Amino acid sequence: MQVLVNHPSHSRQLGPPASADNPLDFSMVDVRLPMLVYVSREKRPGFNHEKKAGAMNALTRCSAVLTNSPFILNLDCDHYINDSQALRAGICFMLGRDSDTVAFVQFPQRFEGVDPTDLYANHNRIFFDGTLRALDGMQGPIYVGTGCLFRRVTLYGFDPPRINVGGPCFPSLGGMFAKARYEKPGLEMTTKAAVAKGKHGFLPLPRKAYGKSEAFVDSIPRASHPSPFAAGAAVVADEATISEAVAVTTAAYEKKTGWGSNIGWVYGTVTEDVVTGYRMHIKGWRSRYCSIYPHAFIGTAPINLTERLYQVLRWSTGSLEIFFSRNNPLFGSTFLHPLQRVAYINITTYPFTAIFLIFYTTVPALSFVTGHFIVQRPTTMFYVYLAIVLGTLLILAVLEVKWAGVTVFEWFRNGQFWMTASCSAYLAAVC
């Protein structure tokens, strides 16, 4: 671990005025920089480092010891910040009216290096600008693994201060039980009472579930303060603090703890992002969709079909892992919005479409081998049903083009690649 930039001072630091060597005037600009720390976590034989999920959990603990900031931004290594106002836009959703139940803010993914025709549907705007935006009207968009701003306490296993995930048309069943659940003695200690109890305040899970670091565990009640920025009390990055931060990133720290199961990013699947967001939603937390221009973050897209299909194979494999695990949305908490549950079911079952697509494209061809037409002669009702289905698909296509703000050609490319992925990556994941 290396501290590249320490905590800034509390007073403003104005830059130098314009000069012959530097024509830019910074005399009215605050040039303080936030703390910058480079962390390389320990990996050793005999301990599963859990890839990205393990790295994010290690960084969560490390940052809690050093800054305990109320918000955490997750960006993949192939993404960069494109708009300096992106964080301000995301934090507005965390600090606005009735925002105390917002767990994370998801930004749409944008990519550079994509060919002009977007042959492999890398932009995927139907999903990022259509589906995610539509989910914002329920409990919010799913977590897609990057470009996401988290509220720190949601990663520690805390429940939301109140639950209101239902709507006038589709009320949540959890609303019937929310009052009884949150009137139990002690549960309201997640806010003011936790701070009043001091450093040994309320924790949603036993202390041992968070590990053996007293400095880290003591930071959790402060992070649950009702005023978010009260949690980020700057500490001096001295030798003792650095040693403690290194200790919480060791390979053995998570042994016999709740990390990866009840705390932090979830282990056991290649799509830890979807499961982590799902765990928050079933507790009653909400998420928000934030799309700004210029684009908040920009990433690098796969440059050939092999890389793109491998990416889709990994996603579809992870979706099936979720479907056949205890995180199956069919059996989720009643605090999950009914339509949000449908969205998660769609996310975990879409690879199965490969079976039906292969069936419908290969079975008719058997007619040429057998000499018999397998499909029965169409009836009048068949044409009626066919007209209804085709009309519905046409309406959905028009709405997707309108809501996602894409052209008909972009919509066609998206459907074209779906056919390609269904006959290859989806099928490989299912088999």
Positions of PLM-derived features:
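Glycosyltransferases that elongate glycans
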Residues: M1-S287, F297-G299, S316-C431
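Carboxylate/His-rich catalytic cores and anion/metal-binding grooves
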Residues: D100, I303-Q311, W315
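The conserved SAM/SAH-binding core of class I Rossmann-like methyltransferase domains
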Residues: C290
